[in-house]
């Protein structure tokens, strides 16, 4: 027996990375998992080095970031890798979620895999928001003020929760210090959840584009899919390097290069680009509590898919009707992100409300109805 199989610890690695049987029909969309793992490693590694030089004191936070950029050897590289790494993390995550929606990765027997993935998504958004606040530029300060104020919409205890989050009566030194603590902690929780994600995936193995059981035609991970993953890793690193070395501030916001000032409100308060769709949904609801519930509902509705999708065929590969509405949903989501950059004025308010309705209608109305129609068509075709 090979040593990698006889050794207790190497056998664990072997079963996940080397001899893990994968369906032979999986395409390059299945490579997003390895890219997300790479992004997580980049974020944790660069984050640890940044934490060595960062000061969480509100008076020194902005200056410490400038110190990293100017005085720390290769500090500019570490910071730009971390900031652009967050954007690439979300790009890969959105594509990964889109792949799961298109190919029905949420359907039984992989419901737990999907559920853990949604939890990872929520934690990643939390980590991104906390990290964005730590720079303590103008957008960091006002973003922290606006988002934490959302908890004041909770009846009876909302204001107490906001005061507890701030550690004071406004965003101040205790706020930044506790945000830094949680921002350092959450990535390790995400790493633990990723291990759980892999463990649950390992039970039934990966799905495939055909939507059928692939147990009859599988290949080992090493030698086939490891090399396939490396191809996309190299492509990823090329685009990542282009941003880090040639256009590092493109995905950021110019107002965040101004020190935070609670006495001056920016012309437009917007989060990072990867949170814009959810910000649009929040702004589309006139009622504060309703907007908060709707915003959190945009993520939690993903957990409803295993229930609302009643199709007997996994994935949209052979379903024309589902394909059309899926790409309509993707277009709508991109439009939500674009509307998040716009000011709250006519016609963007109405457009945001329409896009919000379409977003929820896809999961709660269109998916159940379309799956029922396609099931009926499938049965009628079989009878012929």
From Swiss-Prot:
Its cofactor is heme b. Its main location: mitochondrion. Keywords: Electron transport, Heme, Iron, Membrane, Metal-binding, Mitochondrion, Mitochondrion inner membrane, Respiratory chain, Transmembrane, Transmembrane helix, Transport, Ubiquinone. Pfam families: Cytochrom_B_C (PF00032), Cytochrome_B (PF00033). It is found in: Mitochondrion inner membrane. GO terms for molecular function: metal ion binding; ubiquinol-cytochrome-c reductase activity. It is a multi-pass membrane protein. InterPro entries: Cyt_b/b6_C, Cyt_b/b6_C_sf, Cyt_b/b6_N, Cytb/b6-like_sf, Cytochrome_b, Cytochrome_b_C_euk/bac, Cytochrome_b_N_euk/bac, Di-haem_cyt_TM. The chain crosses the membrane at residues 32-52, 76-98, 113-133, 179-199, 225-245, 289-309, 321-341, 348-368. A ubiquinone binds at residue 202. GO terms for biological process: mitochondrial electron transport, ubiquinol to cytochrome c. It comes from the Eukaryota. PROSITE patterns: CYTB_CTER, CYTB_NTER. Heme b b562 binds at residues 82, 183. CDD domains: cytochrome_b_C, Cytochrome_b_N. GO terms for cellular component: membrane; mitochondrial inner membrane; respiratory chain complex III. Heme b b566 binds at residues 96, 197. Binds 2 heme b groups non-covalently. Heme 1 (or BL or b562) is low-potential and absorbs at about 562 nm, and heme 2 (or BH or b566) is high-potential and absorbs at about 566 nm. Component of the ubiquinol-cytochrome c reductase complex (complex III or cytochrome b-c1 complex) that is part of the mitochondrial respiratory chain. The b-c1 complex mediates electron transfer from ubiquinol to cytochrome c. Contributes to the generation of a proton gradient across the mitochondrial membrane that is then used for ATP synthesis. Fungal cytochrome b-c1 complex contains 10 subunits; 3 respiratory subunits, 2 core proteins and 5 low-molecular weight proteins. Cytochrome b-c1 complex is a homodimer. PANTHER family: CYTOCHROME B. Belongs to the cytochrome b family. This is Cytochrome b. It comes from Eremothecium gossypii (strain ATCC 10895 / CBS 109.51 / FGSC 9923 / NRRL Y-1056).
